[in-house]
Amino acid sequence: MMQQYIEIKAAHADCLLFYRMGDFYELFFDDAEVASRALGITLTKRGKHRGEDIPMCGVPVHAADDYLQKLIALGHRVAVCEQMEDPAEAKKRGYKAVMRRDVVRLVTPGTITEEKLLDPSEANYLMALGRVKGSEELALAWIDISTGIFRVASTAPDRLLADISRIDPRELIVAEPVYHDAELRPVFDMLGRVVVPQPPVFFDSASAAMRLSRFYGVATLDGFGRFSRAELSAIAGAVAYVEKTQKAERPPLAAPERDEEGKSLFIDPSTRANLELARTLSSSREGSLLKAIDRTVTGAGSRLLAERLMSPLTDPQVIAERLDSVSFFLDEPGLRDRLRAFLKGVPDISRALSRLALNRGGPRDLGALSAGLEAAAAAADLLRGKEAPSEISAALSTLLSLPAALVSHLDRALADDLPLLKRDGGFVRGGYDAELDEMRALRDQSRRVIAGMERDLIEETGIRSLKIRHNNILGYYIEVRANNAGALNGTDEAKARFIHRQTMANAMRFTTTELADLETRIANAADRALAIELAVFERLVGEVVAASEPLRAAAQALAVLDVSAALACLAEGEDYCRPVVDGSLDFHIEGGRHPVVEQALRKQLGEPFVANDCDLSPAEGEKAGAIWLLTGPNMGGKSTFLRQNALIAVLAQMGSFVPARSARIGVVDRLFSRVGASDDLARGRSTFMVEMVETAAILNQAGERSLVILDEIGRGTATFDGLSIAWAAVEYLHEKNRCRALFATHFHEMTALTEKLSRLVNVTMRVKEFEGEVIFLHEVARGAADRSYGIQVARLAGLPQTVVERARDVLHRLEEGETGTKAARIVDDLPLFSAAMRQEPPKSKAPDHLREELTALNPDDMTPREALEVLYKLKRLVIEG
């Protein structure tokens, strides 16, 4: 047995091997040690190999999905090795014969289909990278085998990471030579364990057509459209990996669909991370934009919403069509609510279909399809006759074209209460199959039939204590007390009828030909009933898989309806407006709000969000958008203001209403954000280096249709260095990139740039000082700030009072120019607790005569009236100076 294990493991060295042993999957050697640590299960041993104990651990077959989920989440890949025969068959080949086993599938992060292993709200993409040898031409193909989605797009080295980040695959396969390519290696290093090298033959574009024709069972690929060599390489790699992992099974994949270049808003990886579109910087969905806007009621709808958010459009017409769909449901609240009530009960049609096609589905997957199709019919009835916009009309047309015969057949065939596993039976509705009903009656009514036979025998023999019983050894038998046995074996006639089976201390057991025949019929009835049900299951699955294309289309149509209705609910509940998205260079937001922060303020503090305008539209006579130079205090809301405008652009171009009173946005083709500070120590890059690399990427790529938000460029180095870099960056944005931009800074000297840069506008975050306290108004106004109020923020943060006072003193000296040029440079980079600068806090500036009066007072000896008189006297002294 161990030799068999070693041979199978050698063929799947990059996977943990789940080796079937009866009711367990067992792991040995290094696999056992890895799995025991990852799963928290006991590591034991079984036998020896080369004189050493063999480490072993195992998991029950019935709970395997739970353990697979943990391993996949940790990035492991698992080869599932099953027993291909039963022990009896193995013994026929000899008493020492080892049971045949083979790997039936590879479970990898990008190829899972089990409901337990998948997040219903997230797509699960496998991606392949194709490259033409000796060329810069690259392409990406991505598949979700759990839903059948298959897409392909061309890319280039400079935007490869951005395109991969947009799709966010769970697994990226690349040819081994590409994996070791020095130019692409940094990209793969950033992606980590997601990247899996595979044999180059998988990506052979020359044999791609033959591989695809075989996979789809077609003679020609003419109906698929034309693809470049790099695209064919990526497509072939993806299909080859699916064949490798799924073995004999084939998922119902759609034909590859090209994702046209320029169709989506370009957002680089750091911008996606900074804006926290789908996940926060801590990788949590909670607190992300997606979480804030998701009002969908189906898994497919949630996945489509995420896809649209991650790939906003750049075509104003298609954007308008999506907005029309949202407006339609906003204007039809009653229809919308009824539709959403239907959709709430819709199971995941695409994923159920995929499991059935891969022979991993059960009766409940058929039930999910049946329920989904019924909901689709109900949704179609709701929308029928309505004057709906084009996207909704197209969805309705798809739902109306569903195969009615399949819907009816599933409804007639499936029981209301379905078991999880088909081997349990009981999933075919009574009345569907006459023979099945007969077998079930015999199986289920066996007790009644046996009881009737027992009554007949009691009446015939006169033995009132006679019982017909059952055990696993004898089957059914007749039992009488020993003193009554003579009635059953006392005569030759009785002996011929009642066949002796067993003698007990106080009883004897018999059988009859009639009882044996009945037992055989009962046993056969159960087996026959299950066989009939399994045959019905296979027929139904065959019909479903044959109709996979219209079923997938219906699932997508329901997802479109869910997203449109959900965005209407969002717009109504959060008071969002419909944006105007056109081909201009405008960017005019009135009363804009941050969609995530607004909800958090309301939920946690019960406070409203302060709305602000933003106008980056070209001024009269200008051919390029404006740049707002934003100054103001720490904690004033600069970063929030920057992000909210970027998020409004993303929401508008994904086809959603936006958090504002009004919004007019000329299509943004590239969105860049440099907000926040982080380092990259693994690659030897400091916070400032990361900042400069990201800023360089923006300045090298932004064009006139870009929207750029930059926050505190240059803060990671010495003051004058940082100011110089920020100054030059603004000039470059203005003169070379000519893009719409928001640039926040604490370098107040930069406000003078508005005198020489015509499209630069000074704006500031308003504050109010009251009795020595700073009140942050979070309002954006025209003009420039002259202070950053950093010391006030430090005090609010809880810095020791001596530190705060010392900071005030240093600031006062710097502002008054008391220190020389050299000292000023030293202070610029001075550590907070430098011993050289440690001084006593500044003395109080209270007048001497006031101090004398206060010192002379003895509060313990004063009456209330005297104390009041002294208080008035002290007040006069202060007023008179």
Swiss-Prot record:
| UniProt GO MF annotations | ATP binding; ATP-dependent DNA damage sensor activity; damaged DNA binding; mismatched DNA binding
Supply the gene name: mutS
Gene Ontology cellular component annotations, sorted alphabetically: cytosol
The record lists the organism as Chelativorans sp. (strain BNC1)
Instruction: State what this protein does.
Output: This protein is involved in the repair of mismatches in DNA. It is possible that it carries out the mismatch recognition step. This protein has a weak ATPase activity.
Q: Write out the residues that bind ATP.
A: G632, P633, N634, M635, G636, G637, K638, S639
Annotated signal peptide: none
| Keyword DNA repair on entry | yes
Spell out the coiled coil positions from the record. Answer: none
GO BP annotations of the record are: mismatch repair
Q: Give the family per the record.
A: Belongs to the DNA mismatch repair MutS family.
Task: State what protein this is by name.
Answer: DNA mismatch repair protein MutS
Superkingdom, natural source = Bacteria
Mind listing the UniProt keywords for this protein, alphabetically?
Answer: ATP-binding, DNA damage, DNA repair, DNA-binding, Nucleotide-binding
